[in-house]
């Protein structure tokens, strides 16, 4: 199945007013007040601008308080970024994902779903967090601690309950709480992993960073970055994709009947429609701008007619990919995009084949201003044995 099939006519095959987005009503933007850039071409141009600098997502706080630590790859630019990116790229290639991590994805999915069937019910958002943390932890090298405990620690750090409001006092409280939770993450998860990799290096990110002379503080900030990108956001996407597929029997059937490429095409279209991170920030000449990924991914000149409808066979403009700008673009495009899509496909394919599986309760939809993205909680699944 092609990711970009051609319909028999240029006419929009569905209602022009149709809006399949489930997160639109919750979208609010991020913590920074900045002029918005909304068109697809303009947003992509800023993302590809080599003179633009990262902003938002605690960039200023981390760069200010990191002491002598190197900034994580998320905040590097130019030659420093290219050098570090090339050093870690081998952990995210399609071949490595297929040969090294697919078995882990399958085993983890099978274990989680066996528990769902045994218990008769579970929250999809909790299952997806454990799935995402397990896979990302293996790639990064955070394998010397309890996955369930690490999931809770990361969830506490990035959850909306961690947000304390606006203003100087709120910023101070946010920083203090963040430092405490960061120290717990280091003590429980990062420090044991560093010790194990020093004793016996493996093919993972922490071993690579140690070989490059990174200090424990350097590695902590890098793991924090991967914790957000590789774990928390993937958790939200798996839950969102599962919600769409469970509520639309015809889409579920299409997904289960598709080959691997066809399943990825459906997931990419869901991600285009529901980008997990709705706003990215950049420092450019003249100040800071807010890049509205949701608006850009709904730009009909780029993604085709009926931009708010879920249509895996939509015709896009040339050089516009399936997920649009949901994974970013330019030098900071998400390196783990293939991992996220692959593990989502593996997990959801197995989930949706469970006999008697039903969505008992649609999730609560919230908004996390720290990552400028939606949060889905209490998405209840049940398995009816009859």
Residue ranges and their predicted role:
Residues 1-386:
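Cytochrome P450
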């Amino acid at each position: 199945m092609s990711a970009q099939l051609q319909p028999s006519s240029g006419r929009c095959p569905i209602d022009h007013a149709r809006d399949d987005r489930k997160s639109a009503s919750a979208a609010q933007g991020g913590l920074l007040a900045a002029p918005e850039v909304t068109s697809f071409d303009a947003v992509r141009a800023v993302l590809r601008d080599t003179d633009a600098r990262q902003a938002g997502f605690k960039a200023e706080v981390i760069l200010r308080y990191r002491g002598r630590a190197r900034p994580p790859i998320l905040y590097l630019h130019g030659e420093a970024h290219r050098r570090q990116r090339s050093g870690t790229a081998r952990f995210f290639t399609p071949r490595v994902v297929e040969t090294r991590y697919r078995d882990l994805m399958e085993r983890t999915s099978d274990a989680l779903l066996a528990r769902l069937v045994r218990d008769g019910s579970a929250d999809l958002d909790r299952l997806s967090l454990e799935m995402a943390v397990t896979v990302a932890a293996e790639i990064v090298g955070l394998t010397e601690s309890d996955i369930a405990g690490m999931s809770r620690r990361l969830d506490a750090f990035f959850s909306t309950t961690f947000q304390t409001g606006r203003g100087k006092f709120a910023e101070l409280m946010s920083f203090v709480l963040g430092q405490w939770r960061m120290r717990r993450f280091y003590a429980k998860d990062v420090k044991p992993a560093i010790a194990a990799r020093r004793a016996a290096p493996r093919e993972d990110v922490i071993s690579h960073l140690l070989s490059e002379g990174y200090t424990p503080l350097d590695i902590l900030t890098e793991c924090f970055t991967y914790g957000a990108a590789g774990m928390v956001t993937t958790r939200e996407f798996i839950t969102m994709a599962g919600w769409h597929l469970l509520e639309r029997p015809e889409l579920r059937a299409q997904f289960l009947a598709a080959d691997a490429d066809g399943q990825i095409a459906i997931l990419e279209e869901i991600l285009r429609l529901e980008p997990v991170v709705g706003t990215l920030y950049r420092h450019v000449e003249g100040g800071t701008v807010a890049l509205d990924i949701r608006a850009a991914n709904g730009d009909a000149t780029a993604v085709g007619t009926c931009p708010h409808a879920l249509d895996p066979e939509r015709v896009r403009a040339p050089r516009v990919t399936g997920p649009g700008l949901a994974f970013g673009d330019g030098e900071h495009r998400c390196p783990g995009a293939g991992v996220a899509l692959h593990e989502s496909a593996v997990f959801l394919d197995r989930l949706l084949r469970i006999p008697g599986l039903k969505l008992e309760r649609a999730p609560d939809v919230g908004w996390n201003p720290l990552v400028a993205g939606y949060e889905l909680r209490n998405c209840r699944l049940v398995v009816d044995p009859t």
